[in-house]
């Protein structure tokens, strides 16, 4: 079996080929393939009907993408959404893209996680295990072994194995209150920058915890926030964490020393979301900061964004200096995502909109999707770019910036890194309207 496909994906491919051959009257070829696959594929007339158009649909989506001439570094989402994914019974709280495949995970107040095929707009499975609201999800983990992590109001973090039907392989207890945010920490290692065994969680118990996903042990607790920590983001090289919450004071943590490197003062209300700028944004943010030249791309955690219930987005440098305040949303700002191309910042809010801010034009709001959802928009994620020369499992992906530009442990940045990534022009949003929307080329 191909290492690029899970058992489920391989089975669906086989069914699609059999159904396609039958639909174009190549009955002998269809029968021969069924005979060769034997009991590994169970297919009846109803299954044939279901899968007969799937192969063509996949193929035309590939052709459509190949025909796109637009520069992906300038692509911005526009209405209408390509897909509206419905199935959750309560508000959607979080979404996350698989780093390689066309899978999207969404979490909800209904205690479930749903796995969707975002290309087809179809539900793949529902994952159950949490007993209260799922507050965040994230894909990552050791090289060659992508996992899905989830956290919940039930005080736990759970790890799920996508290659084994999303089996719950580990539960991480330890927090004393709701776990609000969870992110895999990149290793920064050459050739596999986004892989790593560490996971960070943020909680209403006012702490950040670092976990080893291979053992399930909490290896470090970061204390310093004086109220609920709602959001956390790791730097691309895994050296720093940027976190914020109800105390209104974001903190930049040095993971090696477990100490606060910088604090950021300015917000007037609870901070709902944080983001670390990719290296591709450095030239534009350096201009806004008044710097004569941008920081080297080998440096991580140079610029940051925060979104707050005070309805503003603020941009900062690593010393805690406020660069710019972005005003435009009419309600709580709930999620942020830097464009992998570096020129834009995207935001969603309880005003039901998606806003696109141009970092090259003094952070002017250049697009508003006013009908993004029918209720508060709670979450936003950008599909991580793919590294073109990744390994067989494709596990050398990045999360928002050219991975090879990150420097860790003396590894020199690759000057050709920008040519090695493929930006996926896809975002997902979730809402209190219980829907997930996919905006894509």
From Swiss-Prot:
Residues 398-410 have a biased composition (Low complexity). This is Nuclear distribution protein nudF. WD repeats lie at residues 87-128, 130-170, 174-221, 224-263, 266-326, 328-367, 372-402, 403-440. Keywords: Cell cycle, Cell division, Coiled coil, Cytoplasm, Cytoskeleton, Microtubule, Mitosis, Repeat, Transport, WD repeat. Self-associates. Interacts with nudE and dynein. Dimerization mediated by the LisH domain may be required to activate dynein. Positively regulates the activity of the minus-end directed microtubule motor protein dynein. May enhance dynein-mediated microtubule sliding by targeting dynein to the microtubule plus end. Required for nuclear migration during vegetative growth as well as development. Required for retrograde early endosome (EE) transport from the hyphal tip. Required for localization of dynein to the mitotic spindle poles. Recruits additional proteins to the dynein complex at SPBs. InterPro entries: Dynein_regulator_LIS1, G-protein_beta_WD-40_rep, LIS1_N, LisH, PAC1-like_LisH-like_dom, WD40/YVTN_repeat-like_dom_sf, WD40_repeat_CS, WD40_repeat_dom_sf. Gene3D superfamilies: 1.20.960.30, YVTN repeat-like/Quinoprotein amine dehydrogenase. GO terms for biological process: cell division; establishment of mitotic spindle orientation; microtubule sliding. CDD domains: WD40. Residues 390-415 are annotated as: Disordered. Pfam families: LisH_PAC1, WD40. Belongs to the WD repeat LIS1/nudF family. It comes from the Eukaryota. Residues 9-41 form the LisH domain. GO terms for molecular function: dynein complex binding. PANTHER family: WD REPEAT-CONTAINING PROTEIN POP1. It is found in: Cytoplasm, Cytoskeleton; Cytoplasm, Cytoskeleton, Spindle pole. The keyword DNA-binding does not apply. GO terms for cellular component: cytoplasm; microtubule; microtubule associated complex; spindle pole. It comes from Neosartorya fischeri (strain ATCC 1020 / DSM 3700 / CBS 544.65 / FGSC A1164 / JCM 1740 / NRRL 181 / WB 181) (Aspergillus fischerianus).
